[in-house]
From Swiss-Prot:
Fourteen ClpP subunits assemble into 2 heptameric rings which stack back to back to give a disk-like structure with a central cavity, resembling the structure of eukaryotic proteasomes. Cleaves peptides in various proteins in a process that requires ATP hydrolysis. Has a chymotrypsin-like activity. Plays a major role in the degradation of misfolded proteins. The gene is clpP. GO terms for biological process: protein quality control for misfolded or incompletely synthesized proteins. This is ATP-dependent Clp protease proteolytic subunit. Belongs to the peptidase S14 family. Disulfide bonds: none annotated.
Amino acid sequence: MIIPTIIEKNVGYDIFSRLLKDRIIFVGGREGEVDTASATMIIAQLLYLDAEDSEREINLYINSPGGLVTAGLAIYDTMQFIKAPITTICMGQAMSFGAVLLAAGSKGKRYALPHARIMIHQPLIWGGGISGQVTDIEIESNELRKNKEHLLDILAHHTGQDKEKIRQDSERNYYMSAQEAKAYGLIDEVLDLKK
């Protein structure tokens, strides 16, 4: 991926560094996935901006298909830990953990563009398949169940929805338009397009 460079007052910035000056952070790594590397970068940016001015708003733009639960929880915990208010804006998609991060913005400051798609589902194991002894698989299965319950609690807290409704809705991929995500409580407003 080529990252554009911006020249401002004889100083060159890559586009993301320039946007960081305006307290704008983008969620996602390669292909927009929330992975350990992208989470580390997002957490560092959140901590930096909070230390710089904990009363000024941070804008978190999300266009992500989701990713690793552990990486997403690291971002989520940081969002809840810092003092600065966080505006979340979905552009394109906020799927899986992307939807959790979207909902985790400061109340009244969670938005989506009109054509954005939001999706919640239960956590899943992805990769090269499951292998190992029965005991190892049971351990992983129990951890997955704990993650599922934890994510249901987080979504219930931020949406105001009943945990059992979220459990039922997220048994399979549950897709929403921006308006449907607003009705569900994942966002507060759908932003109008200027043109």
